[in-house]
Amino acid sequence: MSGADHYLSLPASAKLSKLALTVTTHSSDALKIELQGTKGTQTLDGAAVNVTKLADAQDGLYDLAVLVNGQKAAVVHIAQSANINALYITSDDPATQGRDFVDASKSNIATGKLLVVDKDGKAVYDGALTQLKARGNTTFTNAEKKSYQIKLDGKSDLIACGEKVKTWTLLAGSHDATLMRDKMFKDLAKSLGMPYTASTDWVDLYYDGVYRGTYIVSEKNSVNKTGVNITDMEKAYEACNAGYGENASTALAENKYGQTYQYTTGLTEPENITGGYLLELNGTKVADSDHPKYDEASGFITGKGSAMNVKSPEWCGKDAMAYISEYYQEFEDAVYAQDADGNYTGYNAQT
């Protein structure tokens, strides 16, 4: 251990009276290592450390000096959360597909393991992550603390909301110092009976052994019986494409109205491609441009310059993307349609 200050962030389930602490030094000599707080001193000899007997918390921190042969070498500041669950992500390949890899691009997808532990230390979920990727628009571009999307290998209720789903989001709340806004308004929306409102809860995130802060874990706005209850096109694609979404590559094309769309190559189209589709209006502007652009695997630009992400199905074939981009263009044309006097009519005979 070197340097003046070190911070240890513990989950709510950790026992401060039975903490296992290890101090590593760069010396081969026999050294006496001690922890000293405002209430006492304890030699580190392999026994558990009772933090509460060594120091009182001040401003939420237990401050312990590390003494090496009686000389102060560093200070450890210990903080502990209260009343929220802890979520542990462990990458399958932390060397090449760890957090740095995932944070570098929303196109980078990793796999791993997930452990969710409640405030009392009970495992809520312990299983595989079949997908782990960064998400967000402006927050992804500008914030160091990234948000993520995770996909479990089976449906599970991570936050005791009564709904089991595979796909969840971890919202960083980078632009909200209170970390309350998103949850507060979603809870309000649920109380008002608004449809398609995702359930949320706070968690502490530990990613490959590093504490990343408090996140909001949320159901993803997705197509399912407890979410947006429309025809699930992803299931239709999965039924006719083995390994759907694996090693997917994309290409660009134009629909019959001359608007660009992006699709996934090599897919067999389902027999019925009329829906449902879950769309997202994307307002993020691309570099060196004043115009937004879709930033998912499937997306299109409308005649009015709006950028639309297709959130479900995540990977769309060429015919499906042509269909939904043209359908939306006809909707947009109707919205902006005017008669000879400039009155909006809601009808466009040309489309």
Task: Please report, for each region that a protein language model flagged, where it lies by residue.
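Extracytoplasmic/secretory soluble proteins
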Residues: 77-90, 95-103, 107-110, 127-128, ...
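N-terminal module-boundary/linker segments of secreted carbohydrate-active enzymes
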Residues: 5-8, 52-131
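Short strand-turn-strand beta-turns centered on an Asx-Gly dipeptide
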Residues: 36, 69, 153, 208-209
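ATP-dependent phospho-/nucleotidyl transfer catalytic cores
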Residues: 223-351
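Conserved oxyanion/phosphate-binding beta-strand-loop segments in alpha/beta enzyme cores
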Residues: 110-172, 316-320
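Predominantly extracytoplasmic/ectodomain segments of secreted and cell-surface proteins
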Residues: 1-62, 66-80
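Gly/Thr-rich phosphate-binding loop signature of adenosyl cofactor/nucleotide-binding cores
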Residues: 218
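A conserved hydrophobic secondary-structure block that centers on an alpha-helix together
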Residues: 159-214, 314-350
